[in-house]
């Protein structure tokens, strides 16, 4: 199975970069992981709805450029379905068993995701009703994917 994370924005803080590298290393024994960073658009201080829409559409273009092929697309959205770690592991395992070879997780930028991207999603996943910085969300997602593979393989994990 191949896991791809498409994330709007780049990680700037070294401690978050280090965490991403650590989880990439840990995940390498379970899956091929690819992380794609899409440039985030500069957002004015108080953007109008028109400005927000233009920014989201531009970011969506970058996301769609990387969604060519047979992917099962999971978007991270506040209004998505909340799963516990075992449910996420079951979903990943079920996709693998059903023959899905490529899962793509999409993390939006500071304004979230374009409706166009959300509409292309096979599954909308929510980690919380709270908002997290996209850089931190990437680390949280990687940890949960790692935890999922530990669960799938019957290996111990922290509860």
Curated annotation (Swiss-Prot):
Q: Where does S-adenosyl-L-methionine bind?
A: 76, 108, 127-132
Q: Which gene encodes it?
A: rlmH
Chemical reaction(s) catalysed:
pseudouridine(1915) in 23S rRNA + S-adenosyl-L-methionine = N(3)-methylpseudouridine(1915) in 23S rRNA + S-adenosyl-L-homocysteine + H(+)
Q: Keywords in alphabetical order, please.
A: Cytoplasm, Methyltransferase, rRNA processing, S-adenosyl-L-methionine, Transferase
Q: Which family does it belong to?
A: Belongs to the RNA methyltransferase RlmH family.
For this protein, the record's Pfam families field holds: SPOUT_MTase
Which function does this protein serve?
Specifically methylates the pseudouridine at position 1915 (m3Psi1915) in 23S rRNA.
> Hey, what's the signal peptide range on this chain?
none
Name the species this protein comes from.
Methanococcus vannielii (strain ATCC 35089 / DSM 1224 / JCM 13029 / OCM 148 / SB)
Protein name as catalogued: Putative ribosomal RNA large subunit methyltransferase H
Broadest EC class assigned to this enzyme: transferase
Q: Which GO terms describe its molecular function?
A: rRNA (pseudouridine-N3-)-methyltransferase activity
Location of this chain's protein in the cell: Cytoplasm
Q: What is its EC number?
A: 2.1.1.177
Q: Which Gene Ontology cellular component terms are annotated?
A: cytoplasm
Report the superkingdom from the record: Archaea
